Amino acid sequence: MEQEENHSADHLSAQPGNGNELEESSVKERCFEQREALVGEPRCVICGRYGEYICDQTDDDICSVECKTILLSKLSAETRPVVKAAKRVNLPVGDESFCIRDENFPKIPSMHDGQIASLRSKLDICVKGEDVPDPIMCFSSSGLPEKLVLNLEAAGYVMPTPVQMQVIPSSICNRSLLVSADTGSGKTASFLVPIIAHCSHVRSERCTDKQGPLAIVLAPTRELCLQVEEQAKVLGKGLPFKTALVVGGDPLAQQIYRIENGIELIVGTPGRLIDLLMKHNVDLNKVDVFVLDEVDCLLERGFRDQVMQIFQALSHPQVMMFSATVNSEVEKMSNSLAKNAIHISCGNPSRPNKSVKQVVIWVESKQKKQKIFEIMTSKQHFKPPAVVFVSSRIGADLLSEAITVATGLKVVSIHGDKTMNERRESLRRFLTGEVSVVVCTGVLGRGMDLLKVRQVILFDMPNSIDEYVHQVGRASRMGVEGMAIVFVNEEDRNLFRELVQILKTAGAPIPRELANSKYTTGIPLGGGKKRKLKSR
């Protein structure tokens, strides 16, 4: 049959060998023709062999035409009643389940302006801007596609978090945003939900193959991009919504092939996306949503010029910027990208999450290893899965090995010297519970939704108090209580004053050595010369 002849060429996406198009003869027809998957490689959802291809209909990894046929047969059996109902789309009446318009956006019917202000105050939501939309109380009241609401429920989103209550309606009303919120408050879903709703609406009205992207999300690290894309896939399941991950460490040709075959969302790092745009002709004319996740980190890593270069290639998109902390550089970036943006702040982003109990211990550098061994062998104090932050890449490898030898625990390390596949596999093993401890540099300190983590250990203090806030925040997601154990000593003296203020605000105990240090009391922070002159 003609359909069967074109089956592999039209509906399998694969990593090309010497070009951007897959030769029909190279497609594996049968499962046994495919090799076994190596560590870190995608696996076929049917047989577990190397997932060389992507099934366009489901976005799942598959190894051959045979497994694709099995996958689609299962999908057809599971969704047959839904498929029958969906035939109504062909009638003259439009499918309004995807329609989202500013003028029919539902308000909270039973609340007047005073009650809205009271609600924002109770939820610690602060807004600044003109005609700010009212917050929503549930996902179903925001005009989202029914399938998206079901996906949210299946993913465990029972009701919106405070940041989602305010960001989702503001985004749906096509407003540009600058958002700051506590670590672990649900920022990622707050921008993915309106993106998926928008893309679904556009594609349902103009459904053709191989269309260019409608939205771009930029993030500072490969791990964060990977997680954002994975969450987008979960929330967009069953909707006309496909993604492309554009990060270093993965083959560029595969990323290009994916985009050329039609996607709605690009998630990537600025450097890799610039590289892709310079070497290949990617149509960005229809991109109307531009998201910057962890803006402060993007700026700290020197991505400002690259972000601006990508932005200038777009045609007046809606801009949404998210960060756990907002400083003058972030505000300057906001003013450059979006005029009249709504400023939304939830909680106190400059302080650790209130749900995290901070336990600061004075430990000399030579005693740190022994102290962490004691913690991890104590049933009372060790609450796996746990994340341990260190200051160096080699330190991450050495400490992970030492913990394994001393305690018998399964430990992995993650840092920038690891390949993308190694980092992805280590993170997968940690998130699935195969290992109970991950030792890492600051690469997991930003934005990652480590949902099961309830304990963080700062083996080495970070270089700034902002990074301290981010790393401590890994111990709590979505308001669930967690614990952060922090090792400090004289080497961290530049952070003593700010650290003490944070601990006082949180009502956390302060070690005697820290409280009595001359760097905490009486001597202002500054350069060595200023302290010398003061002491004289």
UniProtKB/Swiss-Prot annotation:
PROSITE patterns: HELICASE_ATP_BIND_1, HELICASE_CTER, Q_MOTIF. GO terms for molecular function: ATP binding; ATP hydrolysis activity; mRNA binding; RNA helicase activity; zinc ion binding. ATP binds at residues 181-188. It catalyses: ATP + H2O = ADP + phosphate + H(+). The lineage of its organism: Eukaryota, Viridiplantae, Streptophyta, Embryophyta, Tracheophyta. Keywords: ATP-binding, Helicase, Hydrolase, Metal-binding, Nucleotide-binding, RNA-binding, Zinc, Zinc-finger. InterPro entries: DEAD/DEAH_box_helicase_dom, Helicase_ATP-bd, Helicase_C-like, P-loop_NTPase, RNA_helicase_DEAD_Q_motif, Znf_HIT. It comes from the Eukaryota. A motif (DEAD box) lies at residues 293-296. The keyword RNA-binding applies. Residues 168-344 form the Helicase ATP-binding domain. This is DEAD-box ATP-dependent RNA helicase 41. The keyword Zinc-finger applies. A motif (Q motif) lies at residues 137-165. Gene3D superfamilies: 3.30.60.220, P-loop containing nucleotide triphosphate hydrolases. Residues 1-25 are annotated as: Disordered. Residues 355-518 form the Helicase C-terminal domain. It comes from Oryza sativa subsp. japonica (Rice). Residues 1-10 have a biased composition (Basic and acidic residues).
